[in-house]
């Protein structure tokens, strides 16, 4: 179980979820969060999205949420975990089903969400 702001304790091994790995200061991460928030507002069946934040610089979660018009359940991860999870560079999103990784997305997040979840 992972403790998330806005959601309390969440079992990432249960059900279907998406988990984004974002660096608070990363412009690509901010852009992805903005696009996903817009997509969520336009969709009736957007899946649960949880964010694991790494804080490298001075940007706070509150500032990130204001910049991106987004607010997702979030938790902090340390530098080693962040680099283990992001691959070559952030952002990265994991699609999980029953705790197993169904897909890993490093770009084209909106189209992956639309195709995978048949968003309307």
Regions found by a protein language model. Give the residues of each.
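Thiol/disulfide oxidoreductase modules built on the thioredoxin-like
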Residues: 80-119
């Amino acid at each position: 179980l992972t403790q998330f702001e806005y959601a309390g304790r969440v079992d990432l091994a249960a059900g279907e979820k998406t988990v984004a790995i974002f660096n608070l200061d990363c412009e690509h991460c901010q852009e992805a969060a903005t696009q996903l928030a817009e997509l969520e507002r336009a969709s009736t069946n957007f899946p649960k999205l949880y964010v694991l934040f790494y804080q490298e610089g001075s940007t706070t979660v509150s500032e990130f949420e204001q910049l991106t018009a987004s607010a997702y359940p979030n938790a902090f991860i340390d530098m080693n975990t962040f680099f283990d999870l992001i691959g070559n560079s952030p952002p990265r999103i994991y699609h999980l089903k029953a705790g197993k990784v169904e897909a890993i997305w490093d770009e084209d997040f909106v189209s992956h969400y639309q195709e995978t979840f048949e968003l309307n």
